[in-house]
């Protein structure tokens, strides 16, 4: 192996002799060499830190008081996309801020999508993922809609696995919560006019979380929004683009200021049909029939949503995906919400046009039955007969 100093000396001498070579080219080559050397050292350092940290529980951590707030962990997974549209080998980096051009497409034109999945700890300490491949498929669908290249499903799942393993000490004990993993795909290349970015970055970071809503497992209080809408036909409501969530903030803030847990949006055309909440899907129960709004292009086809549809049918319920008028919603026996962040959450009341209606909740409710089955599968307590669980350790 050539000594680093001798290699640089020979490189400089060769460029001094060659008159056709520019100093900028020399700088780029030396910079690349220094960068690759630093990268190797950094990777070695991170590997050492990873092996030391991975099994050491964070100090002063009260797992019983976890909410749904960002708690930075140790590592972030990063993967760059070349100009040819191929994603390079990803790597783990220490958690920290990232640098972006002020002209990055994600900042100027919102060219970005994200996913959400969770890692759970079994009683024996091993880690489980719940259907991460479905999140990978959905990211690819979203990327196509947003004119972005996307990692393959295998690359996506591998990134989630690596993120979970690297941050395993932050996975709460069984029954205390989960490690929420946020994969993010964004146009990081600089553009001035409206156009797809020239470069893209995939990231995955993690945070230990408990219940999404401040109510914990208590029934939710929802407010039906009939002024603002979340999505419109032909738009991006069916993908997890970042703009879908920022447009919910005004309505959500208004509802929370009135003491509600979340806001329920109606369709943008008729202002009559139920769509979804700011962060999750909705179901209604009437006897042995369960209904949820059809995924027709304006709502997100949630991974938890599709799982609950299967679980409900396994429990003998008839499940329909169809249009649900808000008047029918208000006459339901039971209402509940589903999502990766929220799990399965029962709805205690809904307010629409100053009319408040209460719904069945409690240990005998349908939603509680589904919640117990779902969380049981996710944590390894209930047998997974569907191949949904990926055990990674």
Swiss-Prot record:
What EC class is this?
A: transferase
Q: Which organism is it from?
A: Humulus lupulus (European hop)
Grouped into one coarse class, the protein's main location is mitochondrion
Name the chain's protein: Branched-chain amino acid aminotransferase 1, mitochondrial
**Protein location:** Mitochondrion
- In the record, what terms sit under GO molecular function? L-isoleucine-2-oxoglutarate transaminase activity; L-leucine-2-oxoglutarate transaminase activity; L-valine-2-oxoglutarate transaminase activity
- One Pfam family per UniProt: Aminotran_4
CDD domains listed in its UniProt record:
BCAT_beta_family (cd01557)
GO CC annotations on file? mitochondrion
Q: What is the lineage of its organism?
A: Eukaryota, Viridiplantae, Streptophyta, Embryophyta, Tracheophyta
In this UniProt entry, the residues modified to N6-(pyridoxal phosphate)lysine are: 240
Alphabetical GO biological process terms: isoleucine biosynthetic process; L-leucine biosynthetic process; L-valine biosynthetic process
Pathway info: Amino-acid biosynthesis; L-isoleucine biosynthesis; L-isoleucine from 2-oxobutanoate: step 4/4; Amino-acid biosynthesis; L-leucine biosynthesis; L-leucine from 3-methyl-2-oxobutanoate: step 4/4; Amino-acid biosynthesis; L-valine biosynthesis; L-valine from pyruvate: step 4/4
On tissue specificity, the annotation reads: Expressed specifically in lupulin glands.
């Amino acid at each position: 192996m050539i000594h680093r100093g001798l290699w640089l000396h020979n490189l400089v001498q060769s460029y001094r002799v060659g008159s056709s070579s520019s100093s900028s080219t020399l700088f780029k080559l030396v910079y690349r060499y220094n960068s690759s050397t630093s990268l190797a050292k950094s990777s070695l350092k991170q590997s050492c830190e990873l092996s030391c940290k991975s099994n050491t529980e964070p100090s002063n951590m009260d797992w019983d008081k976890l909410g749904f707030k960002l708690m930075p962990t140790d590592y972030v997974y990063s993967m760059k996309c070349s100009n040819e549209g191929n994603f390079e080998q990803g790597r783990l980096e220490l958690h920290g801020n990232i640098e972006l051009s002020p002209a990055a497409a994600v900042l100027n034109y919102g060219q970005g999508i994200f996913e959400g999945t969770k890692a759970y700890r079994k009683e024996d300490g091993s880690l489980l993922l719940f259907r991460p491949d479905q999140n990978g498929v959905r990211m690819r669908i979203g990327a196509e809609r947003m004119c972005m290249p996307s990692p393959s499903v295998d690359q996506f799942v591998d990134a989630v696995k690596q993120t979970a393993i690297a941050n395993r000490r932050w996975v709460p004990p069984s029954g205390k919560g989960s490690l929420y993993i946020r994969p993010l795909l964004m146009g990081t290349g600089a553009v001035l006019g409206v156009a797809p970015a020239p470069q893209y970055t995939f990231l995955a970071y993690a945070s230990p979380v408990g219940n999404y809503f401040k109510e914990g497992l208590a029934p939710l209080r929802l407010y039906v929004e009939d002024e603002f809408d979340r999505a419109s036909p032909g738009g991006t409501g069916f993908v997890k683009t970042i703009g879908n969530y920022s447009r919910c903030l005004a309505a959500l803030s208004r509802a929370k200021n009135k003491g509600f847990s979340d806001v329920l949006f109606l369709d943008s055309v008729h202002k009559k049909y139920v769509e979804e909440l700011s962060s999750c899907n909705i179901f209604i129960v009437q006897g042995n029939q369960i209904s949820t709004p059809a995924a027709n292009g304006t709502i997100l086809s949630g991974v938890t949503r599709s799982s609950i549809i299967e679980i409900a049918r396994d429990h003998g319920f008839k499940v329909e995906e169809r249009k649900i008028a808000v008047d029918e919603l208000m006459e339901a026996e039971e209402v509940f919400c589903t999502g990766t962040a929220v799990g399965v959450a029962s709805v205690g009341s809904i307010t629409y046009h100053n009319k408040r209606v209460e719904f069945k909740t409690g240990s005998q409710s349908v939603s509680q039955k589904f919640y117990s089955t779902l969380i049981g599968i996710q944590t390894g307590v209930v047998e997974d007969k569907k191949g949904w669980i990926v055990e990674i350790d």
